[in-house]
Design a protein with these regions (language model features):
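Exposed loop/turn and edge beta-strand positions of beta-sandwich/beta-sheet ligand-binding modules
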Residues: 4, 41, 156
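A short core secondary-structure module
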Residues: 1-28
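A general structural signal for short secondary-structure junctions and capping/turn motifs
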Residues: 11, 35-38, 203
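Flexible, small-/acidic-enriched active-site or ligand-binding loops
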Residues: 22-53
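Long, acidic (Asp/Glu-rich), low-complexity accessory segments flanking structured domains
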Residues: 49-67
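Short, surface-exposed loop/turn microsegments at beta-strand edges and helix-strand junctions
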Residues: 26, 36-38, 61-63, 187-194
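A generic hydrophobic-helix recognition signal that picks specific residues
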Residues: 15, 33, 42, 171, ...
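Alpha-helical interface subdomain recognition
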Residues: 46, 70-228
C-alpha cells in the first residue's frame, strides 16, 4: 500500500467530517487480499493518536456526509462505464469464439441456441451502453449541484442494470465457452476473469438493492401528487 494521503470520514463533535490525512506517525496499513488483484490497494488502515492539521478538513466540519454524497454520482458513473466496457470485451470474445469453435462439424455460431444467447446478451448490453451515453451527455450540460438532484436516481438505476447485464453476459459467456471459461490462460482468460470479478461493480458504490431503492425514491420524490 503506497498511498501518501487518505480521505477519511471521521467522527467529530459536530458529526461526521472528512479529513485529508497524510501518512505519518501513528498510521499503519495492512494489505487485504481480494479476488481481483492488489492493484486496487485494498487495505486495513489503523490510526492511533494521529494529529491532523485544521487545514486538512475537507468541506465544513460535521458536513462530511455531504462531501461523500457529492462524489457518489461520479463514482457510480465511473463504475458503470468500467463494467460496461469489461462486459463488451467479454461479448466480443464470445463472438470470436463462436465463429472459430467447431462442434459436430459446424461452427458454434451456426447453432440456433448460441445465436439466441448472443442476441439476448447483445441487446441487453447495447441498452445499458446507450443509457450510459445519454446520462454522460446530461452530465456535461449540468453543474455538479444540479447533477446531484436530477441524475442521482437515473445513475443509480443505470448502475443496477449495468451490473445485472454484466451478470447475464458473464454467465452466458461461461456456457458458450464451456470448460475454457474456467481457465486462466488462452481464449477463456477474459471469461474466467469476468466470472471472478464482476461482482465488484455490483457492490462498490452501493449494492444493487440500494441502487434500486434510491432510484425509485428519487423518482417518487419528484413525482406530482396524484389527482383523481
Amino acid at each position: 500500500m503506497s498511498c501518501r494521503f487518505f480521505t477519511t470520514a471521521v467522527q467529530t463533535k459536530t458529526g461526521i467530517s472528512m479529513l485529508l490525512i497524510e501518512r505519518g506517525e501513528g498510521m499503519e496499513t495492512k494489505t487485504i487480499k481480494t479476488s481481483y488483484s492488489s492493484s486496487a490497494g485494498t487495505c486495513l488502515i489503523i490510526l492511533e493518536d494521529v494529529k491532523v492539521p485544521v487545514g486538512n478538513l475537507l468541506g465544513a466540519e460535521g458536513q462530511g456526509f455531504l462531501v461523500i454524497m457529492y462524489n457518489f454520482n461520479h463514482e457510480r458513473w465511473y463504475i458503470c462505464a468500467a463494467v460496461i466496457s469489461a462486459t463488451r470485451k467479454v461479448l466480443e470474445e464470445c463472438y470470436k469464439w463462436t465463429n472459430q469453435r467447431t462442434v459436430f462439424g459446424k461452427k458454434l455460431i451456426e447453432q440456433p441456441v448460441i445465436r439466441a444467447k448472443l442476441a439476448h446478451m447483445t441487446s441487453q448490453l447495447e441498452g445499458v451502453y446507450n443509457w450510459l451515453e445519454n446520462i454522460t451527455y446530461q452530465m456535461t450540460q449540468m453543474d455538479y449541484k444540479t447533477q446531484s438532484v436530477k441524475l442521482a436516481g437515473p445513475i443509480a438505476l443505470l448502475k443496477l442494470m449495468s451490473t445485472r447485464v454484466a451478470h447475464l453476459v458473464s454467465d452466458e459467456a461461461c456456457q458458450i465457452f464451456g470448460g475454457r471459461a474456467i481457465t486462466k490462460t488462452g481464449m477463456g482468460r477474459y471469461i474466467e476473469a469476468m466470472q471472478r470479478t464482476y461482482k465488484f461493480a455490483a457492490i462498490l458504490g452501493g449494492s444493487e438493492e440500494i441502487m434500486a431503492d434510491l432510484g425509485i425514491r428519487m423518482a417518487s420524490k419528484g413525482f406530482p401528487e396524484a389527482r383523481l
